[in-house]
């Protein structure tokens, strides 16, 4: 019974739980890799003896965190659990395809670990640029295994996207029109379109790389009339929407959490928030070459990508100010999820500001491939996506599990994590401005101080992760009954009779009525 329940599940709650558990495990693997990176960089001199090994760990860290931690948790975990509940659907549109979406992920993860384990590993960076990833510079099977891993993860995401799009369009209960869709549902809906449009481009790029490596095509080899810059265009046409895929569901979760703990029935400027989500989704496809300001583009091309990149700051700013306005005039309940959400807004804004700086192509030429860029994207990921995940997790955990988290330990976890990530990544701005390049395992002595500070910060984050595991253990062993939250009338997912809602949510389809205030 248990075997068939978890292996052959067609239930959105069980599949969501599988995604959450898998994402937590992958997150621990990715965190372990990041600690290895920071240990190597804690002092000058070599620890791992070899830049190839170092770059293999950097590559695996990035791919694990993106494809096996953030996306499975945000889209697979929260998306599966909450979207059917929020729109009053009995389940997802294609329950068996939903199951396949999940079970493509563990084999993909194993292939990625295999790529690091065979030969000398794939030390290409997560971007897998040729000619470094070519058959010449990376002989052996490592890069091929990484390519197959990405194919499986991509197939999984495409299937999941089809499922979410169909579910949201066709399975809303009467009364939930598109202009009343909860913001988290909107964000995953837009994210699904981004995945559906960008992943096939990545699949094409890495398939061409695969044939370049194995069957003597020359898509990316100038000797046969190819161009390595083509790969960069194809990769970043996927890669830039991908970073919005990683953050948009987080935006949706933060909107729910802030409105909830501010005691508001909805976030400030709901319709503007929806348009902002959609605008970010569209603009995300029009700015990819800002990752390539140093490859020798025309000045007018650079001018366009600079301007277009800055325009993305407008809908993002609308969202940040709407979150601030939601807090205005409210009697806040200072529960752990609100702390994570406020931390998100503050730190994501800092990450966004460094993004506006990097959008200037003239400045980016200097800062490209320095730790300034590392600091920028870790502020929006390590403190954006991850804080959003913890905000959502601490907020909805009683709904998922039926038990309550310990409030004091939750606040301790937040405090440790907040100190840890800021201590890790803020000094990296200084390193970048001082010219320290990325993807090297060693550095001149002049950079020692801030690298040591950064590595101390990563140790604090590691301790915070262990505290989180303790919090989970404590919650399940103490079995505190989860109560219906006070201000829950605005969100359909809290309206069901028990926590967690029964295996099959409904006996019959609900109908929602909105009171005109």
UniProtKB/Swiss-Prot annotation:
Keywords: Calcium, Copper, Electron transport, Heme, Iron, Magnesium, Membrane, Metal-binding, Mitochondrion, Mitochondrion inner membrane, Respiratory chain, Translocase, Transmembrane, Transmembrane helix, Transport. The chain crosses the membrane at residues 17-37, 63-83, 102-122, 145-165, 183-203, 234-254, 268-288, 305-325, 338-358, 380-400, 414-434, 456-476. Its EC number is 7.1.1.9. It is found in: Mitochondrion inner membrane. Cu cation binds at residues 240, 290-291. Mg(2+) binds at residues 368-369. There is a cross-link at residues 240-244 (1'-histidyl-3'-tyrosine (His-Tyr)). It is an enzyme of class 7 (translocase). It comes from the Eukaryota. Ca(2+) binds at residues 40, 45. Its cofactor is heme; Cu cation. One of its GO terms (molecular function) is metal ion binding. Heme a3 binds at residue 376. O2 binds at residue 244. Component of the cytochrome c oxidase, the last enzyme in the mitochondrial electron transport chain which drives oxidative phosphorylation. The respiratory chain contains 3 multisubunit complexes succinate dehydrogenase (complex II, CII), ubiquinol-cytochrome c oxidoreductase (cytochrome b-c1 complex, complex III, CIII) and cytochrome c oxidase (complex IV, CIV), that cooperate to transfer electrons derived from NADH and succinate to molecular oxygen, creating an electrochemical gradient over the inner membrane that drives transmembrane transport and the ATP synthase. Belongs to the heme-copper respiratory oxidase family. Component of the cytochrome c oxidase (complex IV, CIV), a multisubunit enzyme composed of a catalytic core of 3 subunits and several supernumerary subunits. The complex exists as a monomer or a dimer and forms supercomplexes (SCs) in the inner mitochondrial membrane with ubiquinol-cytochrome c oxidoreductase (cytochrome b-c1 complex, complex III, CIII). This is Cytochrome c oxidase subunit 1. It comes from Patiria pectinifera. The gene is COI.
């Amino acid at each position: 019974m248990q075997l068939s329940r978890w292996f052959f599940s067609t239930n959105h709650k069980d599949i969501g739980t599988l995604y959450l558990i898998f994402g937590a495990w992958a997150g621990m693997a990715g965190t372990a890799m990041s600690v290895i990176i920071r240990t190597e960089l804690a002092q000058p001199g070599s620890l791992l003896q070899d830049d190839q090994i170092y770059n293999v760990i950097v590559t695996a860290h990035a791919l694990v965190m993106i494809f096996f931690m953030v996306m499975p948790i945000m889209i697979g975990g929260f998306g599966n659990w909450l979207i059917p509940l929020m729109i009053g659907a009995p389940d997802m549109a294609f329950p068996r395809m939903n199951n396949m979406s999940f079970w493509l992920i563990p084999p993909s993860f194993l292939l990625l670990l295999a790529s690091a384990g065979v030969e000398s590993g794939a030390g290409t960076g997560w971007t897998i640029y040729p000619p470094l990833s070519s058959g010449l510079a990376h002989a052996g099977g490592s890069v091929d295994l990484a390519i197959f891993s990405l194919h499986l993860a991509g197939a999984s995401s495409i299937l999941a996207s089809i499922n979410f799009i169909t579910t949201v369009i066709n399975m809303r209960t009467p009364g939930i029109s598109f202009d009343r869709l909860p913001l988290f549902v909107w964000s995953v809906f837009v994210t699904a379109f981004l995945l559906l449009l960008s992943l096939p481009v990545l699949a094409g790029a890495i398939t061409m790389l695969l044939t370049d490596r194995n069957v003597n095509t020359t898509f990316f080899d100038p000797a046969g009339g190819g161009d390595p810059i083509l790969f960069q265009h194809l990769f970043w046409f996927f890669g830039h929407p991908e970073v919005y895929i990683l953050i948009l569901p987080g935006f949706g979760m933060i909107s729910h959490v802030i409105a909830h703990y501010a005691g508001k029935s909805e976030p400030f400027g709901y319709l503007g928030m929806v348009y902002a989500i959609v605008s970010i989704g569209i603009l995300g496809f029009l700015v990819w070459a800002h990752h390539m300001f140093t490859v020798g583009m025309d000045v007018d091309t650079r001018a366009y990508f600079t301007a277009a990149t800055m325009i993305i700051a407008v809908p993002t700013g609308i969202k940040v100010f709407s979150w601030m306005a939601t807090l205005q005039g409210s009697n806040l309940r200072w529960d752990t999820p609100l702390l994570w959400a406020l931390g998100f807004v503050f730190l994501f804004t800092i990450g966004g500001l460094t993004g506006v700086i990097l959008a200037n192509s003239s400045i980016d030429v200097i800062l490209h491939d320095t730790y300034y860029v590392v600091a920028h994207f870790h502020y929006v990921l390590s403190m954006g996506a991850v804080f959003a995940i913890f905000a959502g997790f601490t907020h909805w955990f009683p709904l998922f599990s039926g038990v309550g988290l310990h409030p004091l330990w939750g606040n301790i976890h937040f405090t440790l994590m907040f100190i840890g990530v800021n201590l890790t990544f803020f000094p990296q701005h200084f390193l970048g401005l001082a010219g320290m390049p990325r993807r090297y395992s060693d550095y001149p002595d002049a950079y020692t101080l801030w690298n040591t500070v950064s590595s101390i910060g990563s140790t604090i984050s590691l301790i915070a992760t262990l505290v989180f595991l303790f919090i989970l253990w404590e919650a399940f062993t103490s079995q505190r009954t989860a109560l219906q939250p006070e201000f829950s009338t605005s969100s359909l997912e809290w309206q069901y009779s028990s926590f967690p809602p029964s295996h099959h949510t409904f006996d019959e389809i609900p109908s929602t009525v909105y009171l005109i205030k």
